[in-house]
């Protein structure tokens, strides 16, 4: 009975979503059919409105074109001049360490026949996926330098990346703003690439010193343990020799000693040894 009820529940769970999907398709088909066959009066009204709009646009021809021209002019103000050539050289290298000074030189060459006035040099870090979003904007360097035709000028700029930016990529944008003798402003993107801020390894800190001390202690303990093991093995392998004196006269050459002395020595060794007290008492009794 329990198995039969579970089968019915499974069938219901499968059939219910299928019914909803089929019902949704039917309703969608009905709505699409209504969209395919609209009322003819609605089409006629839309056509009349479109004709009126076209007539109004023909009557006012210069309203939108003037705005477009102004926008194009505004965009044209920030473009570079064809007679201006720029170069960049990073003095501190292509790496950008965090919380360290980054210096670079910008070269400006006037290849035209009119003077150029270089106004400012600016740099900024931007979001890599969207260069319109500023992450860190540095102070613009005012220059106000006039570069004559067929002349060159170089400018130095430096900035310091923030410490929290270390280890992450950012878009570095370096812009040079200048104008010609007629007063038209121009802007050249000297550098516009994604760079990674590098985190420099600092000197010895507390953790590093503690690690070195710990490793030194381990090495000393290991050397001391090896020394103890080797010393114990050498003691077992080479027993200590104890020096003993001669136990007899076998290895001694006594041929040079007189015979009388040898007889006395043999008698002394054969007779029992008496203590000093007995000797003194015997000597005293003899004298009495």
UniProtKB/Swiss-Prot annotation:
Chief place of localization: endoplasmic reticulum
Keywords: Calcium, Endoplasmic reticulum, Glycoprotein, Membrane, Phosphoprotein, Signal, Transmembrane, Transmembrane helix
InterPro entries linked to this entry: TRAP_alpha (IPR005595)
Region entry Disordered, spans: 34-69, 267-288
Residues annotated as glycosylated: 137, 192
Membrane disposition: Single-pass type I membrane protein
Highest taxon, organism lineage: Eukaryota
GO terms for cellular component: endoplasmic reticulum membrane
Posttranslational modification: Phosphorylated in its cytoplasmic tail.
Ranges facing Lumenal side: 29-208
Record keyword Transmembrane present: yes
Transmembrane portions of the chain: 209-229
Signal peptide: 1-28
Residue numbers on the Cytoplasmic membrane side: 230-288
The keyword Membrane belongs to this UniProt entry's keyword annotation: yes
Free-text function comment from the UniProt entry: TRAP proteins are part of a complex whose function is to bind calcium to the ER membrane and thereby regulate the retention of ER resident proteins. May be involved in the recycling of the translocation apparatus after completion of the translocation process or may function as a membrane-bound chaperone facilitating folding of translocated proteins.
Subunit description: Heterotetramer of TRAP-alpha, TRAP-beta, TRAP-delta and TRAP-gamma.
Miscellaneous comment as given in the Swiss-Prot or TrEMBL entry: Seems to bind calcium.
Annotated domain remarks: Shows a remarkable charge distribution with the N-terminus being highly negatively charged, and the cytoplasmic C-terminus positively charged.
Assigned protein family: Belongs to the TRAP-alpha family.
Protein name: Translocon-associated protein subunit alpha
Name of encoding gene: ssr1
